């Protein structure tokens, strides 16, 4: 699942997505598909619920809001000040080609991104949704304001990119 919201002092993982969306001036190009999402508050509730309610070695899929990419991108674009910018769904093969190109660029610079971006298309172009009744509800997770959490994440991404705030990145740099 995608997690939105902010953690004081930490760089959001979504900076790359904001950079990508900002780089496209006339329209946003993105594949079909979508995923499940939770807020940072809901993650904390799920962890607490697992500690307090779980009996035995159970695994719980955590997801509350199932959203297609077009919906997510429309929210992000609103927080970036470009509401209503056209979102164009690209074919899966085009996403695969872009992944192959990026992988070659990474290899040329001796970078191992950790993902085979060409093979990521099968996942990225699917609707990877989770029913909240399978994990969140049994653990006592409550509804939260997903759009607000996305907005907070995007605002912090912009602040990081424009160097208005200092944060620690994912690698602890």
PLM ranges: what are they?
Residues 1-7:
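Conserved beta-loop-beta element that borders a ligand/cofactor-binding pocket
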Residues 7-12, 21-24:
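Loop-centered beta-sheet repeat module
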Residues 13-17, 104-106:
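Short, hinge-like loop/turn segments at secondary-structure boundaries
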Residues 34-37, 66, 129-130:
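Short aromatic/basic micro-patch
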Residues 44-114, 132, 140-173:
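Mid/C-terminal beta-alpha module of Rossmann-like enzyme folds, strongest
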Residues 98, 115-127:
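Mobile cap/lid helix-loop segments that border enzyme active or cofactor-binding sites
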């Amino acid at each position: 699942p995608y997690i939105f919201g902010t953690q004081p002092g930490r760089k959001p993982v979504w900076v790359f997505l904001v950079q990508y969306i900002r780089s496209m001036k006339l329209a946003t190009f993105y594949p079909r598909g979508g995923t499940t999402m939770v807020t940072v508050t809901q993650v904390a509730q799920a962890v607490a619920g697992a500690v307090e309610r779980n009996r035995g070695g159970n695994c719980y899929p955590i997801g509350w809001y199932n959203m297609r990419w077009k919906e997510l991108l429309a929210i992000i674009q609103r927080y970036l000040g470009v509401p209503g910018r056209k979102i164009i769904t690209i074919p899966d093969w085009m996403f695969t080609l872009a992944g192959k190109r990026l992988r070659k660029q990474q290899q040329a610079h001796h970078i191992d991104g950790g993902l085979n971006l060409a093979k990521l298309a099968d996942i990225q172009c699917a609707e990877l949704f989770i029913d909240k009744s399978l994990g969140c509800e049994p653990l006592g997770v409550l509804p939260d304001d997903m759009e607000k959490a996305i907005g907070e994440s995007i605002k912090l991404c912009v602040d990081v990119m424009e160097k208005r705030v200092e944060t620690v990145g994912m690698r602890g740099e």
